[in-house]
Structure formats: structure tokens, C-alpha cells
Regions:
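Short, contiguous strand/loop micro-motifs
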Residues: 4, 13, 52-53, 105
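Hydrophobic pocket/interface hotspot
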Residues: 17, 29-30, 37, 62, ...
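Short, low-complexity N-terminal intrinsically disordered segments enriched in polar/charged residues
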Residues: 1-35, 149-155
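Hydrophobic alpha-helical core bundles mediating ligand binding, dimerization, or RNAP-core interactions
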Residues: 14-17, 21, 33, 62, ...
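A solvent-exposed, acidic/Ser-Thr-rich amphipathic alpha-helical stretch
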Residues: 7-9, 26-28, 34-88
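A beta-strand edge to alpha-helix "cap/lid" segment located at domain peripheries
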Residues: 2-5, 70-155
């Protein structure tokens, strides 16, 4: 059972994790995850994408998700609603994301993305052990150029 507070998890999610993503601080981002963390991303009808902190034949290295995101976008997060189960080391966040493509990004012509995300976090030792991310891109049908997915495409 968990020994961390409701406030701890809100700070971990909103300030430590998403704050580090917004600052493009890779060390800060990865510090929020256990060494063997797993991340699964669901986007519409696309196949789920999986990332792992350890070598896993069914998942890409965890850092590659953030490498892609930070190389292509300036992210901004707001309008958080948190759900915390501190007793069981779990939390969830529903929030808005604004991804502004960098000029050098192949997604630059697509313009700024405004997404709604919901992330579910299972924690261990005060860090994310399993993160499941669902996001919706309501503007995708009206986009020109390559449709950004927010994560690397399979090779």
C-alpha cells in the first residue's frame, strides 16, 4: 500500500513530469519513471505503441518517445483534472495539450495541435512504473501534410 499523499501524486504528474516535458528536460522526464517502466499509447484506431525503460522485444526504448516529441514540438499542458488513489499508488490526469511544431519538424505544415489526453499512472517507489496514455486529436481530419501522431512511426 502507498505511503505518499494525494498532493505528492499531483506534483509528480503536473510539475515533475509534465513540467519537465514542457521545459524539454529529458533527465527530469526520465527521473519520473522506474528503470523498468512501461508506457503504452493509444491514439484513435491506430495500433497501440509501447515503450519500455528496459530492453523489450515488444517495445521501443522509453527515451525514443520523448526524443521524437521534443525534437518536433514545443509542448504546453494545462487544464488538469486529477484522480488520485494514493493508497494504491495510482493516479490519472485528464488535461489539454498544445503541441506547436518546431520549424525544422516534418510536421511544421500541420500547424499547432490541440489535444485532449488522459493518462493513467501506476507507481512504484514514488515513480511511474506503468503509464497508459489515451489522446484525441480533434483537428486531425482537417490537417494538411503528414498527420502527426506524437510518437515515432514504426520502421
Amino acid at each position: 500500500m502507498g505511503n505518499r499523499t494525494h498532493e505528492y501524486y499531483i506534483r509528480l504528474v503536473e510539475e515533475d513530469y509534465f513540467g519537465s516535458v514542457a521545459r524539454q528536460d529529458m533527465a527530469g522526464i526520465l527521473a519520473c519513471f522506474t528503470e523498468d517502466a512501461r508506457v503504452t499509447i493509444y491514439h484513435g484506431d491506430n495500433e497501440p505503441r509501447r515503450f519500455s525503460g528496459q530492453t523489450d522485444p515488444d517495445a521501443a526504448p522509453l527515451h525514443t518517445f520523448f526524443d521524437h516529441l521534443l525534437a518536433n514540438y514545443d509542448p504546453y499542458f494545462d487544464d488538469f483534472t486529477h484522480f488520485v488513489d494514493a493508497e494504491n499508488d495510482r493516479c490519472a490526469a485528464y488535461f489539454k495539450v498544445r503541441l506547436t511544431p518546431k520549424a525544422s519538424s516534418p510536421y511544421a505544415a500541420s500547424g499547432t495541435l490541440n489535444l485532449r489526453n488522459c493518462n493513467f499512472f501506476e507507481c512504484r517507489d514514488g515513480k511511474f512504473h506503468n503509464m497508459t496514455l489515451y489522446y484525441v486529436n480533434p483537428d486531425a481530419a482537417n490537417m494538411a501534410g503528414p498527420a502527426p501522431t506524437g510518437f515515432p512511426k514504426a520502421n
